[in-house]
From Swiss-Prot:
Gene3D superfamilies: 3.10.20.590, HUPs, Isoleucyl-tRNA Synthetase, Domain 1, Valyl/Leucyl/Isoleucyl-tRNA synthetase, editing domain
Ligand binding (ATP): K618
InterPro entries linked: aa-tRNA-synth_I_CS, aa-tRNA-synth_Ia, Leu-tRNA-ligase, Leu_tRNA-synth_edit, M/V/L/I-tRNA-synth_anticd-bd, Rossmann-like_a/b/a_fold, tRNAsynth_Ia_anticodon-bd, Val/Leu/Ile-tRNA-synth_edit
Positions occupied by motif 'KMSKS' region: 615-619
Native source organism of the sequence: Clavibacter sepedonicus (Clavibacter michiganensis subsp. sepedonicus)
UniProt name for this protein: Leucine--tRNA ligase
Superkingdom field: Bacteria
UniProt motif 'HIGH' region: location: 51-61
Gene Ontology annotations of biological process type: leucyl-tRNA aminoacylation
Chemical reaction(s) catalysed: tRNA(Leu) + L-leucine + ATP = L-leucyl-tRNA(Leu) + AMP + diphosphate
Length: 852
């Protein structure tokens, strides 16, 4: 049965019939294939973050893809050769867990979901180049993951080590730091993450930390400021010094990193992280009593997550290690403690404690009655002349702020005291001097530290890229030769994928036991798979050469298309995917495969789609995209997503009106039935007022679209539709050339947001070809010159009338016209006009008083 939008007279806007017709055309003609390299048009690479195939498309996908498609369609209208591909991020835990639950191969679940999503994408009218479709779980794709790993291994960027890792006790696998949420839980399973010591593979992302921070400057203005800030904070570059403390009874010094080397004279004890390798080394030579105490404390520490350990209001705990360190600036002997508030992966795992000027150190000092020495007088100005306190001088008149008594640290800046030759200096001069002193004596150096840690890529699960390394009988690492790639995943028949804390691939003995590529002797494959963020770190390059069997991508194609001009996706990927992609791009640059260092020139983050203020989910009965499309039509959903507000804002589906969007589309579509002029009509003969509205839209909309003000452009399109309808019903009618011109402009504009409706309008207008390639028409500048303006007429501060007048009208003429309007006559009847202010051509203000 045909669908007719309610409350709309005239022709029936049957969105179901329209969708069926144009879906068939697009499937048959594949109009959005990317032309070959000989196409001389300027190029744009527009990419939406590819989805994980966990089920059908949801409302969040609907928003993101509607926005990304609008961008791609806009640049096609501007005459660009646009690359807009799609694929699936199809490895990962959800597929493996679903396969375990259902007793099937994860391939079966994954590819069934891909087919479901693909059909929904096609129904949604997305202008993808389907010939470039890829799936990261295809051996033809993950072969190049393995190739990239081998290249990094050759350069020393991939390495294996024993370390404490984040362990998900539910999914039974390790997590990168970035996959642990702020509350200490897994971003996948929600389980509380614990620490476990394992031998794992890492990528040296820290070698690129400075470049990753500094190159963010290239992205200012084209990436959201929030994302830039999140990446800077995550990398966490700190500038300071490394200071070497001699520990009595130990040959090697203990090096600590500090951002405040100026406060070295205030260091009264040292603290090491109990779970650090350093702590284990320090207690080796300690007494049995200390070692026993340490073992118990370490066990208690390992039951805590990093959030708990870092909480400032948690009571401080620790144990003395029975060791003494020597402060290099004053020779003072200070005790060495182990305490859980120090984390093993910050700096060297050891800190110099300056309790007077650091709250956590102060809390610890007060808990264990350790010395507190003030070395910064925060009451003194940091500029100007001040009194210098002698080296042996006492802190004057500061009883009430002494941290040891008040329990409140003094973290601010001021002048150095109790610091020998540094006395009287402010922070930066003191830092400079103490670093010079340390370097001269060989006891320290200027240094940087980073919050960022090397990328842990090992995963103890099946459904991922096998690591292309084998081990000989001695355990030596051997790279799988490139001509033996891909190392394919084995069949799951007879293989138990249930998480057991070790890689299920190790149980696949026929797969695991192989001859050594070096000499044919018995060897064993690495049983781990790669973090799936490896898959997505470079997928955008594979789209350039998706069917190339000889290389990951063609560097010539990369030069032609990359970097990506516009990337579209959620802010939830700010740290993980985006940071890793930036890292891998820089690696590929250093290896000579690409000529650029940043993958995404511009980034658009869309907000979330909510329901009643809450995030949607199937378990909570969230809105179903398929049902919404059945009810309102695809175009109405797409238009609603773009019209709801700025893209970065969240959309509450209860606050928007897809039915209203459907009514508007029906109204726009019916315009084509009222047009009687031929396609070749001379537009310049049409109604001038409507042409001015049309060409103002043509002139202003591109800038709005490039600034992602989609909602404003849609509002202006609605205004143009109203102007057309008014011209048809109250003006020269549907045969006027300007009506055809304006309606064609509406069709082109709607092609960005409502492609089915726009294509049907274009056909009904008698135009050949697809509206998607019709081109954005140039505005006639002569029609942008304002010849008339709306003058507002006020009486006693209230608007009583409006006049459409010549832009060059004089004050006297404008006043005379205003006095004759019906609104002014009514408002001044029985009153005396005292004063008239005229600001031609826009305002007339009349002031009255009651008549005598």
């Amino acid at each position: 049965m045909a669908h007719e939008t309610p409350d709309t007279p005239g022709e029936t806007y049957d969105f179901r019939a329209i969708e069926a017709e144009w879906s068939e055309v697009w499937e048959r003609e594949q109009p959005f294939r990317t032309p070959d390299a000989s196409d001389s048009r300027p190029r744009k690479y527009i990419l939406d973050m590819f989805p994980y195939p966990s089920g059908d498309l949801h409302m969040g996908h609907a928003e993101a893809f509607a926005l990304g498609d609008a961008v791609a369609r806009y640049w096609r209208q501007q005459g660009f050769n646009v690359l807009h591909p799609i694929g699936w991020d199809s490895f990962g835990l959800p597929a493996e867990n679903a396969a375990i639950k259902r007793g099937v191969d994860p391939r079966e679940w994954t590819y069934a979901n891909i087919e479901t999503q693909k059909q929904s994408m096609k129904r949604y009218g997305l202008s993808f180049d389907w010939e470039r479709e890829l799936h990261t779980s295809d051996p033809e794709y993950y072969r190049w993951n393995q190739w990239l790993f081998l290249k990094m291994h050759e350069k020393g960027l991939a390495y294996r080590k024993d370390s404490w890792v984040n362990w998900d006790p539910v999914d039974q696998t390790v997590l990168a730091n970035e996959q642990v949420l702020p509350d200490g839980t897994s971003d996948r399973s929600g389980a509380v993450v614990v620490k476990k010591k394992l031998t794992q593979w890492y990528l040296r992302i820290t070698d690129y930390a400075d470049r990753l921070v500094d190159d963010l400057n290239q992205l200012e203005g084209t990436w959201p400021a929030k994302v830039l800030s999140m990446q800077r904070n995550w990398i966490g570059r700190s500038i300071g010094a490394e200071v070497d403390f001699v520990v009595e009874g130990r040959d090697e010094p203990v090096t600590v990193f500090t951002t405040r080397p100026d406060t070295l004279h205030g260091a009264t004890f040292m603290v090491v992280a109990p779970d650090s390798d350093l702590a284990a080394e320090l207690v080796e030579g300690a007494s049995e009593e200390v070692r026993e105490s340490f073992r118990g404390y370490l066990e208690r520490t390992q039951r805590l997550n990093e959030i708990e350990r870092s909480t400032t209001d948690r009571p401080k705990t620790g144990i003395p290690l029975g060791l003494t360190a020597i402060n290099p600036v004053n020779g003072e002997r200070i005790p060495v403690w182990a305490a859980d508030y120090v984390l093993a992966d910050y700096g060297t795992g050891a800190v110099m404690a300056v309790p007077a000027h650091d709250q956590r150190d102060l809390d610890f000092a007060r808990a264990f009655d350790l010395p507190v020495r003030v070395v910064v007088d925060t009451t003194q100005p940091v500029t100007g002349a001040i009194r210098i306190i002698p080296e042996d001088g006492e802190l004057p008149d500061l009883e009430e702020v002494l941290p040891g008594r008040t329990g409140v640290a003094l973290p601010g800046e001021g002048r150095l005291i109790n610091s020998g030759s540094l006395n009287g200096l402010s922070k930066q001069p003191a830092i400079k001097r103490v670093i010079e002193q340390l370097e001269a004596e060989g006891r320290g150096r200027a240094a940087k530290n980073y919050r960022l840690r090397d990328w842990l890529i090992s995963r103890q699960r099946f459904w991922g890229t096998p690591i292309p390394i084998v081990y000989d009988a001695e355990g030596s690492e051997i790279r799988v030769p490139e001509d033996q790639l891909p190392v394919r995943l084995p069949d799951t028949e007879g293989l138990d994928l249930t998480p057991k804390g070790k890689s299920p691939l190790a149980a696949a003995t026929a797969w695991s036991n192989v001859p050594s590529p070096v000499d044919g002797s018995p060897a064993t494959r690495d049983p781990d798979t790669m973090d799936t963020f490896m898959d997505s770190s470079w997928y955008w390059l594979r789209f350039l050469s998706p069917n190339d069997a000889t290389k990951a991508f063609d560097p010539a194609d990369a030069d032609r298309w990359a970097p990506i001009d516009q990337y579209v996706g959620g802010v939830e990927h700010a740290i993980l995917h985006l940071l890793y992609s930036r890292f891998i791009t820089k690696v590929l640059f250093d290896l000579g495969y690409v000529t650029f260092t940043e993958p995404f020139s511009a980034l658009l983050n869309q907000g979330m789609v909510l329901s009643g203020g809450s995030k949607m989910s199937k378990s909570k009965g969230g809105v179903d995209l398929g049902s919404e499309m059945d009810r309102h039509g695809v175009d109405a959903i797409r238009l609603t997503m773009a019209f709801a507000g700025p893209p970065e804002d969240d959309i509450d589906w209860e606050d928007v009106s897809p039915s209203g969007s459907a009514k508007f589309l029906a109204r726009a579509w019916r315009l084509t039935g009222d047009i009687t002029s031929a396609p070749e009509v001379e537009w310049k003969t049409g109604d001038e007022a409507l042409r001015r509205v049309t060409h103002r839209f043509l002139a202003e909309a591109p800038g709005m679209l490039e600034a992602f003000k989609f909602n404003v452009v849609i509002a202006r399109t609605m205004e143009l539709v109203n102007a057309i309808r008014k011209t048809i019903d109250q003006g020269p009618g549907g045969g006027d050339a300007a009506v055809r011109e304006a309606t064609e402009v509406v069709a082109v504009a709607l092609s960005l947001f409502a492609p089915y409706t726009a294509e049907d309008m274009w056909k009904r207008l008698g135009r050949e070809g697809s509206v998607a390639f019709a081109g954005w028409r140039k505005a006639d500048r002569n029609l942008l010159v304002q010849t008339t303006v709306t003058a507002v007429v006020q009486v006693d501060g209230k608007v009583r009338d409006k006049l459409e007048v010549d832009a060059k009208i004089g004050a006297d003429e404008l006043e005379a016209l205003a006095r004759e309007t019906a609104g002014v006559r009514r408002s001044t009847a029985g009153r005396t006009i005292d004063k008239v202010i005229v600001r031609a051509p826009k305002i007339v203000s009349i002031t009255t008083t009651p008549a005598p």
